[in-house]
Amino acid sequence: MILRELNILNYKNIREASLRFSDKLNCFVGLNGQGKTNLLDAIYYLSFTKSAYNTVDSQNITHTEEMAMIQGLYDFGEPSSDALETISCGIKRGVKKQFRRGKKDYKRLIEHIGLIPLVMVSPQDSELISEGSDERRRFMDGVISQYDRSYLEHLMQYNALLKQRNALLKQYEEHPSQAPTELFEVIEIQMVEHALYIYYQRTDFIQRFVPAFQEMYAAISGESEQVSLQYISQLQERDLQEAFARTRPRDLIVGWTTQGIHKDELDMRLGDYPLKRVGSQGQQKSYLLAMKLGQAIFLGKPILLLDDIFDKLDAERVERIIQLVSSHRFGQIFITDTDRQHLTAMLDKTPSIATTFQVTNGQFNAL
């Protein structure tokens, strides 16, 4: 999967840009706030039909403008005349966005997810450690959805049923004795069906993903530290349908569903201790990088976006990361940095297959 060309109009601070890319390494250098991250976000948008940072589409349109457009020309690497395809999105204030493959609009955006596998590494990844379990579930969901479209369908159905059950709990919160048992059971039976699929897919993913993650961490840290990542779910210990019935009285009191796969967690450890508690900034950054680079290995050379990845890392880890991402194990890479030295070190390893852009106030000049 290669992004050959990208055209942008009125996306955030990028008023107009037409760029052609290298198959391997594409570097963007410039001060903070100039548009480097916005460029990566536009590429992300074409994979996931939304921004990585702001899901309110109208707020991603350049201020004072009424519409924005992102268009990418992709090489799917297939031995046919249709290997090159255009993916485009049009955003207009007050109007539903149009997402198109070639000349055909998608009826449902979910149909596009997984077509263009992509992994993004950004400073926002720190929320995987610092924030609640919903961030870690979102990580699992984001990876699995790229190779299993049924997973995303099950997840959407489960969340819709969860919303229904929570609304019903709220409705009878003050009069729990009047709660309609049969209606609850109808909803819960359907929730269990979707929850089991999600649970088994998450279990399978973590089992297959962890070796790649640990390999990447060892490469970054110099094999000096041991890390682990464990999937924790209530379904590992109990029958969910029985749990729904047993906890329904308590759920009616609190007004929300206390059991289910929406409570799943990832236990992130450095040695025998929680990463959040004992990990230094550099160790936490290395752990997150290993998760994302492991994801790239797991998905099989997706487009890889690396935004400001060297911050908070010592010189030795920076050197190991440069060697790692410059290797043949990764596909097309887009990387940003304010420090030209880091990018120069990468370019020295891949000089013939790299392009570099200077980014200034939303404009991109090839170097």
Where are these regions (language model features)?
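Conserved lysine of the Walker
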Residues: K36
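Active-site residues of response regulator receiver
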Residues: D307
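Structural recognition of the conserved hydrophobic beta-strand(s) that form the central parallel beta-sheet
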Residues: G72, Q332-D339
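Post-Walker A helix-loop "phosphate-sensing" segment adjacent to the P-loop in P-loop NTPases
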Residues: Y44-D57, G294-K301
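Conserved NTPase motor "head" modules and their coupling/switch loops across ABC/AAA+ ATPases, GTPases
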Residues: M1-L31, H175-L304, K312, E316, ...
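A conserved P-loop NTPase coupling/switch region
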Residues: I110-L118, S122-I189, E193, G362, ...
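Nucleotide-state sensing region of NTPase/ATPase domains
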Residues: F48-E135, I144-Y147, Y151, V210-Q214, ...
